[in-house]
């Protein structure tokens, strides 16, 4: 999937990532082989970025990490694997310093799952996500607006964006298939990205 790498082009075009969001000491939760840290030259104010994956512990609890540890928290396509994304989200905020930023990417349920759940493209997905809907076809759907508004910390929303610039809406018809995982292609994105700031109170 390489969601972090695919999102780099958008981050380059927005100076806030290099000057505000990805600054200081951070952690990339669920980084796998595609950590944001590999693009260190694009984020010159980033001092360090720890990669966190399954061998490091439960990403939902982040139990070994103290409160208010990191200047930024980055995560690409990890929240959908959590048993309880609300608990995970609050713990990710817990380890973020006040004034720090969380940059998170999650799959959009319509573009990625394409109307079927449990996921046929990634069976470990436990939830689907949408920016906001009155009603979803997925019984496990989470509205991002609801997740953010129910956080146990004070936050400021800096950005919410559907990353669909390289998603080809007519591709299934073109290749004559009913469904296809476009993240298998080198450029295909079908994600939601949100950036939030943890406030002091």
Where are these regions (language model features)?
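Residue-level recognition of oxygen-bearing side chains
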Residues: 70, 84-87
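Helix-to-beta-strand junctions that scaffold the AdoMet/dcAdoMet cofactor pocket
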Residues: 82-83, 96-97
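S-adenosyl-L-methionine-dependent methyltransferase catalytic module, highlighting the catalytic core
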Residues: 21, 86-93, 101-201
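Conserved N-terminal segment of class I S-adenosyl-L-methionine
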Residues: 1-68, 72, 161-175, 186-201
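Glycine-rich, phosphate-binding/catalytic loops in enzymes
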Residues: 43-46, 66-68, 90-95, 120-123
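Glycine/Thr-rich phosphate-binding loops of Rossmann-like dinucleotide-binding domains
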Residues: 37, 83, 112
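A short beta-strand submotif of the Rossmann-like class I SAM-dependent methyltransferase core
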Residues: 72-78
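Generic anion/oxyanion-binding catalytic loop in active/binding sites
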Residues: 59-62, 77, 133
């Amino acid at each position: 999937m390489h969601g972090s790498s695919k999102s780099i082009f958008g981050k380059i075009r927005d100076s806030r990532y290099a000057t505000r969001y990805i600054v200081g000491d951070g952690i990339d939760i669920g980084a796998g082989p595609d950590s944001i840290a590999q693009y260190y030259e694009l984020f010159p104010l980033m001092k360090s970025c720890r990669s966190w994956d399954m061998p490091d512990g439960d990403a939902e609890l982040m139990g070994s990490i103290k409160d208010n540890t990191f200047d930024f928290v980055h995560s690409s396509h990890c929240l959908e694997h959590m048993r309880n994304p609300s608990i995970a989200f609050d713990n990710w905020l817990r380890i973020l310093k006040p004034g720090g930023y969380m940059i998170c990417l999650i799959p959009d349920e319509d573009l990625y799952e394409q109307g079927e759940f449990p996921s046929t493209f990634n069976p470990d997905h436990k939830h689907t996500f949408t920016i906001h809907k009155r009603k979803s076809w997925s019984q496990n759907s989470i509205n991002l607006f609801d997740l953010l508004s129910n956080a146990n910390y004070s936050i400021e929303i800096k950005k919410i964006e559907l990353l669909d610039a390289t998603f080809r809406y007519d591709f299934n018809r073109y290749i004559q298939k009913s469904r296809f995982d476009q993240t298998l292609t080198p450029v295909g994105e079908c994600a939601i990205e949100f950036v939030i700031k943890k406030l002091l109170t």
